[in-house]
């Protein structure tokens, strides 16, 4: 018997796979698992129900399938009890299962340390933030299960972020936009490897893992901004300015921008709103300089660079590579504060900076903090992570930034140094 029997953070896969749950057709527990398929994002058990006779592909409880498990009847080629509100998951799944890709998939296996007992963390996803959040889980498996070798399945563009200590990296040569596909070639690669291990588990790949205990330097090789040096280092603020997720001045402006996107030939007019965002960022910088004349600024993001002159170091680009990623990460790590619109673009900035001011759209209230790599357990969270309305004017953003600098010493002393919290 494994010493991890019943461990809720591990899903037994080989040699004795755990059934994902009851039969979704008849609710019977009398099910038999006849293997597992790894076609891409989903990891699915090949299940036969001894009660109703259904043959199914049923999601193992990893990633988003932990909360939203899907099942496919392999006889009828149809989803089982699919909820319409979850069509963002089941529609791509059944579409690609019905038309699997025959394209070869290049998977590069890099072995750092051989292990006979392993846990596989599948981070494949079609969204940048989803991949990164799944990858954050690696830290917990490395720390909690030192006798299990960690294998990370990762899109090639994320390979630079795989943390030190990982036993194996299976780097998949697919773009994020291709990750929805059903790839027999990828499954064949995994199947060929599985039987070479004595014991295999799946890592849960939680969608929103605890971050405050994670050592981000293990992932990026860059030490994050040390909180105790907040008011000792030169003031530095980094703005994250994407062209595809804008800071709008008004609600009518946002409506017009979206309407232009549907009008084909008029899409070019949307560039005006990108320029408007730059003007708002520069107004924020000027307002910050009124209170903190020595402040320095960096601008990053997927965008065409230019327009900031000597006001800020402009690291924006549309051509991403590992060198650009590292330049951005170093900018975050030198920053007391990062400022940006809600989105996955805030995960690495907040993992390295001391704090942030986030512009939060109304339709993302339910996702608040999901894009923030929260570094602090205590009341410093409230002080260091600030959220403003999506139409907040530049001076409002600037007031939050300058208040973080002017009030840090007093707040930090009263809420962390003068008390018992720092002894935990």
Where are these regions (language model features)?
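Catalytic donor nucleotide-activated moiety binding site of glycosyltransferases and closely related
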Residues: 239-245, 262-325
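Short loop/helix-cap segments at secondary-structure boundaries that form the rim of catalytic
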Residues: 161-166, 305-314, 348-352
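A short, glycine/small-residue-rich beta-strand->loop->alpha-helix junction that serves as a flexible
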Residues: 124-134, 245-250, 274-276
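Secretory-pathway glycan-assembly enzymes, especially type II membrane glycosyltransferases
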Residues: 1-236, 240
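A donor-sugar binding/catalytic signature common to diverse glycosyltransferases
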Residues: 328-371
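Leloir-type glycosyltransferase catalytic cores
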Residues: 205-222, 368-424
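Short, polar loop motifs at secondary-structure junctions
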Residues: 156-158, 301-306, 342-346
